[in-house]
């Protein structure tokens, strides 16, 4: 879908709606305040690095698990020294930590949680209103935090 223009998603046969948010392709990535790592540290997305951010509804779903495992496996074979990879969800930091350990996820992926106030989820326009969860997406940003591309599948059960 086109972020900022299309606000309808599907969960199977059910219609869902995205918040509008402030993020747009060509614009700046909204500030990521109050994100928390699995180690319970406050985290801000760093400036000056190329980023690929995966937002997922919940790591405790089969689709999210498959998506992140595939990402982790792909990073074991690539040199990604110039790009940083992030997974953001509203899962608690404890749930993220468990997921990382149980699934042997690559340390090249930084997990962060927006569980506390959902600010990043709302400001990016990726909040599914009916579920109060992130839409599944991939956000690509350059070193200046300019959003280069946002991929959001129409059906949240599909991997972008």
Question: What feature does the model see in each segment?
Answer:
Residues 1-160:
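Chalcogenol-based redox active-site neighborhoods
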């Amino acid at each position: 879908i086109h972020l900022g223009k299309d606000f309808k998603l599907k969960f199977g046969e059910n219609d869902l709606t995205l918040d509008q948010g402030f993020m747009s392709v060509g614009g700046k990535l909204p500030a990521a305040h109050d994100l928390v790592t699995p180690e319970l540290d406050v985290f801000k997305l760093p400036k000056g690095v190329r980023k690929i951010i995966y937002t997922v509804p919940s790591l405790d779903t089969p689709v999210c698990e498959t998506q992140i495992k595939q990402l982790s496996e792909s990073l074991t074979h690539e040199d990604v020294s110039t790009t940083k990879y992030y997974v953001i969800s509203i899962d608690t930091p404890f749930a993220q930590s468990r997921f990382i350990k149980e699934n042997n996820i690559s340390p090249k992926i930084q997990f962060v949680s927006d569980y506390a106030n959902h600010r990043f989820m709302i400001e990016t326009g990726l909040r599914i209103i009916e579920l109060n969860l992130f839409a599944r997406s991939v956000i690509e940003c350059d070193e200046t935090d300019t959003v280069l591309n946002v991929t959001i599948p129409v059906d949240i059960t599909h991997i972008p």
